[in-house]
Amino acid sequence: MYRTLGSIALLAGGAAAHGAVTSYNIAGKDYPGYSGFAPTGQDVIQWQWPDYNPVLSASDPKLRCNGGTGAALYAEAAPGDTITATWAQWTHSQGPILVWMYKCPGDFSSCDGSGAGWFKIDEAGFHGDGTTVFLDTETPSGWDIAKLVGGNKSWSSKIPDGLAPGNYLVRHELIALHQANNPQFYPECAQIKVTGSGTAEPAASYKAAIPGYCQQSDPNISFNINDHSLPQEYKIPGPPVFKGTASAKARAFQA
């Protein structure tokens, strides 16, 4: 169940800009994340990442976990518990926040996040309502991602109620849109063992592959934030957010 982190070389210049998740608080317990500028062989819950620089293509395999290759440890949490991720630094105030989970088919040691198994547990965009909204591009503070710039650089999400137990990856993703038509993706992954006796699992309509949940040409990915002649709208990419028991009940009612 445990794996040792491999070593990876980093350029010091990568620390000068952008950012990455470097710590977590899960179910009230603090967990250090991977520190790319510290000695190798770190026993942490987070998949190692190469640097603070973005993934620039929606089809790049690194989009899944920023090139991460596994972790030695995992956190334990129950449905309804809170996951808080903290970034060491963050400077971009326009774009969405997406938080995903993925149920591993077995042990973490063989879990690579492949296939259409990723589901969102949280998202925030312009004013954080997760729907198409009119966007005032001259007011970057209208984006919830701006809270990472002016606040403590942390974002909290809840594990879906009634989520079935098992080994999961949790993936935090920031998509910076401050450069028109040139999106920047910042994903990191960590390992969580969900406990309890829940039975809620997302249906196929809530799941997606990463990469694959979006295309580079999508209007909400290659987004011209500076073009005021266009209808100023933004819809967060990907499937709807899975809320666990509530989502399962809603689906059963619709059926």
Swiss-Prot record:
Disulfide bonds join 65-189, 104-111. Keywords: Carbohydrate metabolism, Cellulose degradation, Copper, Disulfide bond, Glycoprotein, Metal-binding, Monooxygenase, Oxidoreductase, Polysaccharide degradation, Secreted, Signal. Binds 1 copper ion per subunit. Changing residue 178 to A/E/Q: Decreases cellulase activity and O(2) consumption, with decoupling O(2) utilization from substrate hydroxylation. It is found in: Secreted. Gene3D superfamilies: 2.70.50.70. Residues 1-19 form the signal peptide. Its cofactor is Cu(2+). Glycans are attached at residues 152, 220. The keyword Disulfide bond applies. Its EC number is 1.14.99.56. It catalyses: [(1->4)-beta-D-glucosyl]n+m + reduced acceptor + O2 = 4-dehydro-beta-D-glucosyl-[(1->4)-beta-D-glucosyl]n-1 + [(1->4)-beta-D-glucosyl]m + acceptor + H2O. It comes from the Eukaryota. It is an enzyme of class 1 (oxidoreductase). Its main location: secreted. O2 binds at residues 178, 184. It holds the Pfam family AA9. One of its GO terms (cellular component) is extracellular region. One of its GO terms (biological process) is cellulose catabolic process. Lignocellulose is the most abundant polymeric composite on Earth and is a recalcitrant but promising renewable substrate for industrial biotechnology applications. Together with cellobiose dehydrogenases (CDHs) an enzymatic system capable of oxidative cellulose cleavage is formed, which increases the efficiency of cellulases and put LPMOs at focus of biofuel research. GO terms for molecular function: metal ion binding; monooxygenase activity. Cu(2+) binds at residues 18, 92, 186. Belongs to the polysaccharide monooxygenase AA9 family. Lytic polysaccharide monooxygenase (LPMO) that depolymerizes crystalline and amorphous polysaccharides via the oxidation of scissile alpha- or beta-(1-4)-glycosidic bonds, yielding specifically C1 oxidation product. Catalysis by LPMOs requires the reduction of the active-site copper from Cu(II) to Cu(I) by a reducing agent and H(2)O(2) or O(2) as a cosubstrate. Is active on regenerated amorphous cellulose (RAC) in the presence of ascorbic acid or 3-methylcatechol. Also acts on phosphoric acid swollen cellulose (PASC) as a substrate. This is AA9 family lytic polysaccharide monooxygenase D. It comes from Thermothelomyces thermophilus (strain ATCC 42464 / BCRC 31852 / DSM 1799). The lineage of its organism: Eukaryota, Fungi, Dikarya, Ascomycota, Pezizomycotina.
